[in-house]
Amino acid sequence: MMYHIPGVLSPKDVARFREQLEQAEWVDGRVTTGAQGAQVKNNQQVDTRSALYAALQNEVLNAVNQHALFFAAALPRTLSTPLFNRYQNNETYGFHVDGAVRSHPQNGWMRTDLSATLFLSDPQSYDGGELVVNDTFGQHRVKLPAGDLVLYPSSSLHCVTPVTRGVRVASFMWIQSMIRDDKKRAMLFELDTNIQSLKSRHGESEEILSLLNLYHNLLREWSEI
């Protein structure tokens, strides 16, 4: 399943990010990809050795960790270190699949269950640059408002189309979920969102408490901690 997570960063935060990223040191984006991805990748990334990078990636981690909808959809166990990329002048990233595992500074290795892109450029400011994701439900083309995030299975083939005007800047990361199976995770998300909707409309009740108990028992049964 693919999820649109709105408002991860406020407009004020997005403007500050963009201003700071204009001063960043950018390097060839192929430094962080494997042999297969390097053949189709043509973009730039912020140098991960810079002090600015360290500060901004911490802010992204804090923002997603505090976003209730992100947590409900991803049920994260481990988040990768966020990276930042830039596309301009017809730069693109052809169809590829993300690696199944990635190194992690604290945990050694993590499994990539979900991929996330946090858009930092207004969609009207550039042409092209759609994230195209192929999954079992077909092909999806994604170009979200700045500050919004898209979450999708890392097992999906995906690409970024050429940016023919303007500049597309984004942050991206990977998530190891407490729930490895996409279908089970989707069922838990649907159950959770419906419980929250019922609570907002009708308040607390024995039936809602029973559904909440079911949710946590399923999470207990399926989670890998």
UniProtKB/Swiss-Prot annotation:
Molecular functions (GO terms): 2-oxoglutarate-dependent dioxygenase activity; iron ion binding; L-ascorbic acid binding
Co-factor: note: Binds 1 Fe(2+) ion per subunit.
Enzyme nomenclature, EC number: 1.14.11.-
Residues annotated to bind Fe cation: H96, D98, H158
Residues that hold 2-oxoglutarate according to the record: R168
Span of domain Fe2OG dioxygenase: 78-177
Gene3D superfamilies: q2cbj1_9rhob like domain, Rabenosyn, Rab binding domain
Obligatory cofactor(s): Fe(2+); L-ascorbate
Superkingdom, taxonomy of origin: Bacteria
Enzyme class: oxidoreductase
InterPro entries tied to this protein: Oxoglu/Fe-dep_dioxygenase_dom, PKHD_C, PKHD_hydroxylase, Pro_4_hyd_alph, Pro_4_hyd_alph_FE2OG_OXY
Biological processes, Gene Ontology terms: DNA damage response; intracellular iron ion homeostasis
Record keywords: Dioxygenase, Iron, Metal-binding, Oxidoreductase, Vitamin C
Pfam family name, one: PKHD_C
HAMAP family named in the record: Hydroxyl_YbiX
Name assigned to this protein: PKHD-type hydroxylase YbiX
Organism of origin: Escherichia fergusonii (strain ATCC 35469 / DSM 13698 / CCUG 18766 / IAM 14443 / JCM 21226 / LMG 7866 / NBRC 102419 / NCTC 12128 / CDC 0568-73)
Lineage per the UniProt record: Bacteria, Pseudomonadati, Pseudomonadota, Gammaproteobacteria, Enterobacterales
Gene: ybiX
